[in-house]
Amino acid sequence: MLLPYNEWRHVFKLDPAKEIEEAALQAIATSGTDAIIVGGTDDITLDATLDLLMRLRRYPVAVALEVSELEAATMGFDAYLTPSVLNSGTLEHVIDKQVEALEEVGHMLAHQDLVGEGYIVLNADAKVARVTQAKLLNDDQVVAYAQLADSVFRMPIIYLEYSGMYGDPSLVASVKRVLKQGRLFYGGGIDSIERAQEMLTHADTIVVGNIIYDNLEAALATVAATR
């Protein structure tokens, strides 16, 4: 049985713009992870997204699409995650791109599991920070953004995105304490079971991505943190 997003504890994230061999893909899909998110920051095409989806459909694992590029939106996923970068310096990445996408493909997704993500980007050196012109935040501001996303906007997912850098566990814990209904996702720098375990003591869900392409065995080891 495929788990819904609000029961995920461990998730792998695959970038359609990056190559992954079939043996590695099989290892990821059969690792015991709760789900696989398909998404990336740039060079995301429909062909690459469809190819990755078709390859993943051979395995009994939930597959979600992060709808960050209109061109890559397609049917066939178990869930559709719609990211709004709350600390973006431009409305384009808070609401404009999302509205544009739903204008074009919203009719196709009307009966699908469409889930909003309130992204807070916390690594100023990451590509996603540059693309979205993310504003630098202090700890109090991070907590306030998360509380706004949770209690006012009622977003089902609040996502702390460190994108390649390991974040501050105490800040993740502070964010978790103010959430009333949203699920806290954490992504960034999880490259060992120890880091996975540490972040899972605070976040509801950890997202493991970059390490897949650098050290597959280390990535696979993180799944055991949920046991």
Swiss-Prot record:
| Gene Ontology MF, one | heptaprenylglyceryl phosphate synthase activity
> What top-tier enzyme class does this entry carry?
transferase
Q: Please tell me where Mg(2+) binds in this chain.
A: 15, 41
Q: Which Gene3D superfamilies match?
A: FMN-linked oxidoreductases
Keywords, comma-separated and alphabetical: Lipid biosynthesis, Lipid metabolism, Magnesium, Metal-binding, Phospholipid biosynthesis, Phospholipid metabolism, Transferase
Q: In which pathway does it act?
A: Membrane lipid metabolism; glycerophospholipid metabolism
A GO BP entry: glycerophospholipid biosynthetic process
Supply the EC number(s).
2.5.1.n9
Q: Does the keyword Lipid metabolism apply?
A: yes
Required cofactor names: Mg(2+)
Record-annotated membrane-spanning stretches: none
Provide the reaction this enzyme catalyses.
sn-glycerol 1-phosphate + all-trans-heptaprenyl diphosphate = 3-heptaprenyl-sn-glycero-1-phosphate + diphosphate
- Output the Pfam families linked to this UniProt entry: PcrB (PF01884)
Spell out the subunit comment. Answer: Homodimer.
Question: What's this protein's family per the entry?
Answer: Belongs to the GGGP/HepGP synthase family. Group I subfamily.
| Known function | Prenyltransferase that catalyzes in vivo the transfer of the heptaprenyl moiety of heptaprenyl pyrophosphate (HepPP; 35 carbon atoms) to the C3 hydroxyl of sn-glycerol-1-phosphate (G1P), producing heptaprenylglyceryl phosphate (HepGP). This reaction is an ether-bond-formation step in the biosynthesis of archaea-type G1P-based membrane lipids found in Bacillales.
HAMAP family cross-referenced by the UniProt entry: GGGP_HepGP_synthase
Official protein name in the record: Heptaprenylglyceryl phosphate synthase
Source organism per UniProt: Exiguobacterium sibiricum (strain DSM 17290 / CCUG 55495 / CIP 109462 / JCM 13490 / 255-15)
Q: Which gene encodes it?
A: pcrB
